[in-house]
């Protein structure tokens, strides 16, 4: 989501996310004739060690996750399940997409 909703102090990070999405869309067009599909997964906050190193207290982290409509951070399994779908035949006609995985958060 950083590519769409940049924040103060994150210009390079946000620009890099936008570049990755653009690159993936270009690759999708270039590789489609060979039946190679390229998509992006754009997750919001996923509960990993990185969150724990972010400097927030446990109480602040618990409060922050309540801002998501689903009232929790994403889990690594949430990303893995979407990746498995994208790899499956069920997504055979999907390429060039940037898929938000945000627990309902719009920003």
Predicted feature locations:
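Active-site "substrate specificity/gating" loop of NAD(P)-dependent dehydrogenases
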Residues: 4-10, 32
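A conserved structural motif in NAD(P)-dependent oxidoreductases
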Residues: 68-79
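Active-site helix of classical SDR
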Residues: 16, 24
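Alpha-helical segment proximal to the catalytic Tyr-Lys
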Residues: 29-33, 92
């Amino acid at each position: 989501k950083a590519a769409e909703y940049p924040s103060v102090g994150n210009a390079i990070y946000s620009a890099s996310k936008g570049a990755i999405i653009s690159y993936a869309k270009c690759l999708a067009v270039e590789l489609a004739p060979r039946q190679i599909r390229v998509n992006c997964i754009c997750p919001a906050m996923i509960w990993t060690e990185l969150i724990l190193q972010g400097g927030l207290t446990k109480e602040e982290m618990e409060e922050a996750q309540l801002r998501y409509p689903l009232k929790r951070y994403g889990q690594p399994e949430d990303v893995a399940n979407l990746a498995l779908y994208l790899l499956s035949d069920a997504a055979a006609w999907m390429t060039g997409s940037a898929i938000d995985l945000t627990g309902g958060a719009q920003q």
